[in-house]
């Protein structure tokens, strides 16, 4: 099953009520039917004043309940470099003696994300073509399209409609830990035949660790599902498709499930 739910960077979007969404006047900036330029610009809602009211044939499905939800998403990166450079000293008048300079470096980084919720509620809707057509014909949406369509691509434009939301209830927590470490070493070795190896060496280590956490006691919209609506100058009509995590055109952002 393809992943299509994208988490929001902020936890300050209050959940909308079903009645407010059905009536076309949602009380949250993250509501079903909202049109946005991208997930990175969730605050820039194109139809912020009002959304097209849902027709009776296009109801909201949910809530689907998920209880005692835990999500751990961690990344760890590491990089190491090393090498040795031999420098013969014979041209300098010291026969059969070699000078070796060794360089080494290491870098590591780890980032951990952890969410825990008592309860998640999932709401989705399936927009019909007639509903989407009414949405893009609203004055504020037409103005946005006229201003942002690409003349370099023959008038192409795209917007994203929120078609699903996941509301976190019961107080979620988010913890992050970031650790970085650096090591840099230099070693100089003199090698002389039949003589014990000797030489100066130097090493430097630096380490840095940051740990922080936030708690969220109120309910908020945690994740959204999106439909991409786009029209090319080469086509007479627009098309719509659900955005999945593997979709490269969605700026590389990954879906969680």
UniProtKB/Swiss-Prot annotation:
Give a GO biological-process term.
Answer: programmed cell death
Q: Does the keyword Electron transport apply?
A: no
Location in or out of the cell: Cytoplasm; Cell membrane
List the GO molecular function terms: protein heterodimerization activity; wide pore channel activity
> Topology with regard to the membrane?
Multi-pass membrane protein
The record's Gene Ontology cellular component field reads: cytoplasm; plasma membrane
Keywords assigned by UniProt?
Cell membrane, Cytoplasm, Membrane, Necrosis, Transmembrane, Transmembrane beta strand
Family from the record: Belongs to the gasdermin family.
Q: What subunit structure does UniProt give?
A: Heterooligomer; the heterooligomer with rcd-1-2 forms a ring-shaped pore complex when inserted in the membrane.
Functional summary from the UniProt entry: Gasdermin-like protein involved in heterokaryon incompatibility, a process that ensures that during spontaneous vegetative cell fusion, only compatible cells from the same colony survive (non-self-recognition). In N.crassa, the rcd-1 locus exists as 2 incompatible alleles, rcd-1-1 (this entry) and rcd-1-2 (AC P0DW10). During the allorecognition process, forms a heterooligomer with rcd-1-2, thereby forming a functional gasdermin-like complex that binds to membranes and forms pores, triggering cell death. Binds negatively charged phospholipids, such as cardiolipin and phosphatidylserine.
Task: Tell me what this protein is called.
Answer: Gasdermin-like protein rcd-1-1
**Gene symbol of the encoding locus:** rcd-1-1
């Amino acid at each position: 099953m393809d992943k299509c739910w994208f988490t929001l960077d902020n936890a300050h979007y209050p959940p909308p009520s079903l009645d407010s969404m059905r009536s076309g006047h949602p009380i949250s900036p993250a509501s079903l039917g909202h049109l946005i330029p991208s997930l990175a610009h969730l605050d820039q809602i194109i139809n912020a004043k009002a959304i097209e009211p849902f027709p009776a044939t296009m109801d909201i499905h949910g809530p689907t309940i998920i209880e005692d939800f835990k999500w751990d998403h961690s990344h760890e990166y590491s990089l190491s470099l090393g090498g040795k450079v031999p420098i013969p000293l014979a041209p300098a008048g010291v026969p059969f003696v070699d000078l070796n300079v060794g360089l080494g470096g290491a870098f590591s980084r780890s980032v951990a994300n952890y969410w825990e919720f008592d309860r998640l509620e999932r709401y989705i809707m399936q927009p019909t073509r007639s509903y989407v057509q009414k949405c893009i014909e609203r004055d504020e949406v037409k103005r946005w399209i006229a201003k942002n369509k690409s003349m370099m691509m023959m008038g192409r434009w795209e917007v994203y409609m929120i078609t699903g939301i996941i509301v976190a209830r019961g107080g979620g927590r988010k913890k992050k830990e970031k650790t970085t470490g650096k090591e840099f070493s230099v070693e100089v070795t003199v090698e002389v035949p039949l003589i014990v190896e000797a030489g100066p060496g130097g090493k430097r280590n630096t380490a840095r660790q940051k740990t922080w956490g936030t708690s969220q006691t109120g309910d908020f919209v945690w994740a959204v599902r999106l439909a991409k609506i786009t029209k090319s100058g080469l086509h007479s009509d627009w098309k719509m498709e659900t955005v999945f995590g593997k979709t490269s055109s969605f700026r590389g952002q990954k879906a969680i499930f």
